[in-house]
Every structure is written in structure tokens, then in C-alpha cells.
């Protein structure tokens, strides 16, 4: 079995986790939105690329829309996915150029750029395990998209305090988390075992931390911590005990960072910004700490990818908002996008209501 064959499992895991963490009345729309984003990304990636390139491009496009759920239209999902798929292709080419920058001899006319060339040769970390072109890019995009889309209706009270909107199907989200774990083998099989250690230690840490913080364990935060630990573990590439420590830190930081975003009216029910945006930085920080890489190496790579995704999302979001197609109509969102847009609910046998 080719490693690229695991990527669809990772994509399915992300879709299921988002659908499970969202509202019941928008679960179908969330799933369809994810399929649209994945499909657009795969088609763009397939232009002049291999099947693995197409799947990586589709995964990046999908992850960029995770967390938005039923807050955006299918048009928005398609446009955002197309923009990030193109950004992914550009970032892959840029990474290859920067990674080889130290091997090129600059002509005399460009001699003034020699310090920049030397700086890139030292501090640019190549895109291993698609850490920049997929994960960090998607994390930055998700942050920008969540800020442009705004919170779900009713998520915050008039005094600014967040109102509880519990995940409607945590078992579905849990299945999604396990599929993310299995599918992550596609990014780097040699790093997957260490990443597994980080992921499960992050899961347990998040359960314990939420128990201490809230008085009850919170599975939704635990799944976010699991995802963060998985990506941080892939990014760190360290041995067993350091991977264990990376997971512990990732489990705490994922919860704390998601809560911090919530206080700033960034409604991220999946924790995608922590899992895909912050976790790669935690991974390379672990490399610095345990001497696997020199201090500072990789932070430029991470920053470029996150910034590229963030700017792309803000620009596309502003354009879509200007045309009035960014979000569904408030009446559709309140009544449920499944019924209003598709004429059928994900759970027709149950009464759908807000928790």
C-alpha cells in the first residue's frame, strides 16, 4: 500500500471531526462543504502533478476550511479552497528554491543579495512531512477565514461572554480523530511512531488538564489536543521520551490557545488553528530544545507559510463578503442550513434543537 493512499483517511478524519464538533442542524452542510473544498484542491493539484501532489493539495484546501462548518456557503468553500490550493503549489516551488539557495552562485549583478542567500541557507528548513505547504499554510488560512467569517450566531452573549455550543456528536469527532492518526502516516512514515506517542500523550494531558480546569473532562478539547500532539510530533521528529514531552506540552497549549482565541471572538470549535497553525511551531521548537536543529532554524519557513495562508484568507474573505456570498443568510443559519439549503436534515428522526 502506497503511503499516499493514507491521505484520504486523514481528509475523512478532518471532515468527520468538524461535522461532529459542529451543530446538528448544519452537519450535512459541513460535510458537503468539506467535500467541495477537497475536490477543488485535488483537481487543481492534479494539473501537472502526481497523484500524491493532488492529494496533498486537496488536503491543504480542505484543512483551510475546517472549523467554518455551516458558517460559509459552498461558493466560499470552493473559492477559498482554490486560493489555498494555488498557494500550496507556489509554496512547494518556493520551498524547493529556498532549500537549494545556498548551492547557487549569485551573478555579480546580484552580489548585494548574498547576505539574504546565506541567511536563507541557514534558517530555512525544508518542507519535510508537508509541514509548511499543508499544515502551517492551513493553520494560517483557518485563522484568517475564521476571523473573516465571524462567530456562529448565538455563540456570544450581548456582554461578550461566550455561550456554550457543545459538539453535537462527539463519537463522530472521536472517529475522525482516529482517522487523522491513521492517515498521518502519509506525511512521513518514519516520523509517525513518534507522532503517535505525542498524540496520545496530548490526549491524556488534555483530559487531565480540562478536569483540573473545569471540574469535568472535556472530550472535545481532548480531541483538539490529540490533533495538535499528532502534528507537533510529526514536526519534532524526536525520540520516545522527547515525543512524550512534546505531547504533554501540546495538550496543554492546544486547550489554552483555543480558549484564548475564544476570548477574542474567534469561534474555532475544532481547534484547527492550534492543531495546524501552532503545532508545527511547537514541533520545530522541540527540535531546537533537544539539539536536533540549531536555534531559529525553521521559524522563517513556518512564518512564511502561516502568513501566506492568513493573507490569502483575508483577501478572499473580504472579496466574498463584498459580493454578499461569504455566509448563508442569517435565517438559513438559524433554521439550519441542512433543511434550508438541502431540504433534509442529517438526523431526520430526531428533534433538532440548540443545546
Q: What do these predicted regions represent?
A:
Residues 1-355:
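Hydrophobic alpha-helical transmembrane bundles of multi-pass membrane proteins
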Amino acid at each position: 500500500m502506497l503511503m499516499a493512499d493514507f491521505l484520504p483517511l486523514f481528509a475523512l478524519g478532518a471532515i468527520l471531526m468538524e461535522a461532529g464538533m459542529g451543530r446538528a442542524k448544519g452537519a450535512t452542510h459541513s460535510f458537503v462543504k468539506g467535500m467541495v473544498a477537497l475536490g477543488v484542491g485535488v483537481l487543481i493539484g492534479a494539473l501537472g502533478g502526481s497523484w500524491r501532489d493532488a492529494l496533498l493539495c486537496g488536503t491543504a484546501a480542505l484543512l483551510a476550511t475546517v472549523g467554518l462548518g455551516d458558517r460559509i456557503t459552498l461558493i466560499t468553500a470552493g473559492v477559498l479552497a482554490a486560493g489555498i490550493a494555488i498557494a500550496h503549489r507556489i509554496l512547494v516551488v518556493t520551498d524547493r528554491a529556498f532549500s537549494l539557495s545556498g548551492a547557487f552562485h549569485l551573478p555579480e549583478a546580484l552580489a548585494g543579495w548574498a547576505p539574504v542567500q546565506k541567511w536563507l541557507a541557514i534558517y530555512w528548513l525544508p518542507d519535510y512531512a508537508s509541514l509548511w505547504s499543508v499544515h502551517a499554510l492551513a493553520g494560517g488560512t483557518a485563522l484568517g477565514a475564521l476571523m473573516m467569517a465571524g462567530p456562529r450566531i448565538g455563540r456570544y452573549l450581548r456582554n461578550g461572554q461566550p455561550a456554550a455550543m457543545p459538539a453535537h456528536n462527539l463519537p463522530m469527532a472521536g472517529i475522525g480523530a482516529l482517522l487523522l492518526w491513521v492517515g498521518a502516516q502519509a506525511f512521513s512514515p518514519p516520523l509517525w511512531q513518534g507522532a503517535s506517542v505525542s498524540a496520545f500523550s496530548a490526549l491524556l494531558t488534555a483530559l487531565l488538564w480540562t478536569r483540573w480546569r473545569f471540574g469535568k473532562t472535556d472530550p472535545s478539547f481532548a480531541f483538539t489536543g490529540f490533533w495538535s500532539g499528532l502534528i507537533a510530533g510529526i514536526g519534532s521528529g524526536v525520540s520516545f521520551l522527547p515525543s512524550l514531552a512534546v505531547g504533554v506540552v501540546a495538550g496543554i497549549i492546544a486547550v489554552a490557545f483555543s480558549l484564548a482565541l475564544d476570548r477574542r471572538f474567534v469561534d474555532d470549535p475544532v481547534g484547527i488553528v492550534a492543531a495546524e497553525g501552532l503545532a508545527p511551531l511547537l514541533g520545530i521548537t522541540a527540535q531546537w530544545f533537544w539539539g536536533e536543529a540549531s536555534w531559529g532554524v525553521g521559524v522563517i519557513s513556518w512564518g512564511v507559510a502561516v502568513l501566506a495562508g492568513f493573507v490569502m484568507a483575508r483577501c478572499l474573505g473580504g472579496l466574498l463578503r463584498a459580493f454578499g456570498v461569504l455566509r448563508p443568510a442569517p435565517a438559513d443559519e438559524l433554521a439550519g442550513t441542512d433543511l434550508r439549503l438541502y431540504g433534509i436534515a442529517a438526523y431526520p428522526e430526531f428533534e433538532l434543537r440548540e443545546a
